[in-house]
């Protein structure tokens, strides 16, 4: 009986005794079968389970949900700000009026950034500049105009210039896009107020203070250099001085645009007319170079300068030599000018006889032409020959004149009847008759 009890005891102790004695081996395997949650919960509280795993267990939902939070402080601390910021954004988005489309877009974009975790990445990328990729970047700066310090000075007019020419030149010099924005940037105040109240995002700058907006686009180094140069140039226009070089140039340009220089141009017209008179002088030197053929130049020169008279009587230079006294030369301009007319008109000679007597025209042509006439006279007297050279003059006059000359008498240049003959002899060398 004792053996049976022992065997039954062994059989009864088998599941309990060995299980209790060998807790390390079989108990973990049998615990899921027999619902040994108590023993497992009592002996193994499972402190390393996360909140989700602890919530899945049926026996330790309360303590397991409360205990894991302090066990993982890092994760809870990281998630707390995002969990607080995201619901606030969602609540603001729901509370917004549907008509505010821009605010809705901004909130939705911010929510997406937080959900994707892109905020830190973008912030890190914006803090670095890539100088080797040569990518263009856009720089924007707003320079405040000191309107509050100098309310009576027209900074906008000084920056824009007459008809906007000043700001156009400034943009060309700096290579930046420059514009004047803010309150007071528009000339029509009523229209500015209307646009400000309209709520158009294009005119949102009207709610800002008056400023100069500078925008540059290019590689990083060039963009910052252009921005610095543009700001330095804009700074010159923010000086409230009406007597500086910039304002003086603008006043001069405004006078040109308003038509003030037109009278000066009208003055320049007569000046050009006077300058048009110089163009005739070029033909005058040409007439001088050509000689007597052009009729206008000689009389002009003879009347004004007197040099053309000398040039006209250059062939009779010996005659000028025979007239040393200056008073005769002074009184000769009118006849000399007429002498130029004599060259134009062969037969009608207007000059006075005294002038030709003083010139002593015989001295110039005595040695050259009268030898031939002496030969003709010694050989024979031809009426036709004397008719050609004397224009129908009597032979007696020629005989007396020739004998007197070659006998060397020269009775004080007595040749009044031979004056037309002198004109004939004068015309003969030119070959006109």
UniProtKB/Swiss-Prot annotation:
Residue ranges occupied by any KH domain in the UniProt entry: 171-197
InterPro entries the record matches: BBP-like, KH_1_KHDC4/BBP-like, KH_dom, KH_dom_type_1_sf, Qua1_dom, Sam68-YY
GO biological process terms, semicolon-separated: G2/M transition of mitotic cell cycle; mRNA processing; negative regulation of DNA-templated transcription; positive regulation of RNA export from nucleus; positive regulation of translational initiation; regulation of alternative mRNA splicing, via spliceosome; regulation of RNA export from nucleus; RNA splicing
UniProt modification remark: Tyrosine phosphorylated by several non-receptor tyrosine kinases including LCK, FYN and JAK3. Acetylated. Positively correlates with ability to bind RNA.
Keyword terms of this UniProt record: Acetylation, Cell cycle, Cytoplasm, Membrane, Methylation, mRNA processing, mRNA splicing, Nucleus, Phosphoprotein, RNA-binding, SH3-binding, Transcription, Transcription regulation
Entry-linked Pfam families: KH-I_KHDC4-BBP, Qua1, Sam68-YY
Region called Disordered, residue ranges: 1-79, 259-305, 317-351, 403-433
Record region (Involved in homodimerization): 82-243
Localization terms from the record: Nucleus; Cytoplasm; Membrane
SUPFAM superfamilies, alphabetized: Eukaryotic type KH-domain (KH-domain type I) (SSF54791)
Residue ranges, compositional bias (Low complexity): 41-76, 329-342
GO cellular component: cytoplasm; membrane; nucleus
Extent of Basic and acidic residues compositional bias: 424-433
Amino acid composition bias (Pro residues), ranges on this chain: 277-300
Family as reported in the entry's similarity comment: Belongs to the KHDRBS family.
Purpose of the protein: Recruited and tyrosine phosphorylated by several receptor systems, for example the T-cell, leptin and insulin receptors. Once phosphorylated, functions as an adapter protein in signal transduction cascades by binding to SH2 and SH3 domain-containing proteins. Role in G2-M progression in the cell cycle. Represses CBP-dependent transcriptional activation apparently by competing with other nuclear factors for binding to CBP. Also acts as a putative regulator of mRNA stability and/or translation rates and mediates mRNA nuclear export.
Subunit structure: Self-associates to form homooligomers when bound to RNA, oligomerization appears to be limited when binding to proteins.
Name of protein: KH domain-containing, RNA-binding, signal transduction-associated protein 1
Gene name of this polypeptide: KHDRBS1
């Amino acid at each position: 009986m004792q053996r049976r009890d022992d065997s039954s005891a062994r059989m009864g102790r088998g599941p309990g005794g060995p299980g209790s004695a060998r807790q390390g081996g079989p108990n973990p395997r049998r615990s899921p079968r027999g619902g040994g949650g108590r023993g497992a919960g009592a002996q193994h509280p499972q402190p390393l389970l996360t909140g989700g795993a602890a919530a899945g267990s049926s026996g330790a939902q309360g303590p397991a949900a409360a205990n894991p939070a302090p066990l993982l402080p890092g994760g809870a601390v990281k998630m707390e700000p995002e969990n607080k910021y995201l619901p606030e954004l969602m609540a603001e988005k729901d509370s917004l009026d549907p008509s505010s489309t821009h605010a809705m877009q901004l909130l939705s974009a911010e929510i997406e950034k937080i959900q994707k975790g892109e905020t830190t990445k973008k912030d890190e990328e914006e803090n670095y500049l890539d100088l080797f990729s040569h990518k263009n970047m856009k720089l924007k700066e707003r320079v405040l105009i000191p309107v509050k310090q100098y309310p009576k000075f027209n900074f906008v007019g000084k920056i824009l210039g007459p008809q906007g020419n000043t700001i156009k030149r400034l943009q060309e010099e700096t290579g930046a896009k420059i514009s004047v924005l803010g309150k007071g940037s528009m000339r029509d105040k009523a229209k500015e107020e209307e646009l400000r109240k309209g709520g158009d995002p294009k005119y949102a700058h009207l709610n800002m203070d008056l400023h100069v907006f500078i925008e540059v686009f290019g590689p990083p180094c060039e963009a910052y250099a252009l921005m610095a140069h543009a700001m330095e140039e804009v700074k010159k226009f923010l000086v409230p001085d009406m007597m500086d070089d910039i304002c003086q140039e603008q006043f001069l340009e405004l006078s040109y645009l308003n038509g003030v220089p037109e009278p000066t141009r009208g003055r320049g017209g007569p000046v050009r007319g006077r300058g048009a008179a110089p163009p005739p002088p070029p033909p005058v030197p040409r007439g001088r170079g050509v000689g007597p053929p052009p009729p206008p130049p000689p009389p002009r020169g003879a009347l004004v300068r007197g040099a053309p008279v000398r040039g006209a009587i250059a062939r009779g230079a010996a005659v000028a030599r025979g007239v040393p006294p200056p008073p005769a030369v002074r009184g000769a301009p009118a006849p000399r000018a007429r002498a130029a007319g004599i060259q134009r008109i062969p037969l009608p000679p207007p000059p006075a006889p005294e002038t030709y007597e003083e010139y002593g025209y015989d001295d110039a042509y005595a040695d050259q032409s009268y030898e031939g006439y002496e030969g003709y006279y010694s050989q024979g007297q031809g009426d036709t020959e004397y008719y050609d050279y004397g224009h129908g003059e009597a032979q007696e006059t020629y005989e007396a004149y020739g004998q007197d000359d070659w006998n060397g008498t020269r009775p004080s240049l007595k040749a009044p009847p031979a004056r037309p003959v002198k004109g004939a002899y004068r015309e003969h060398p030119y070959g006109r008759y």
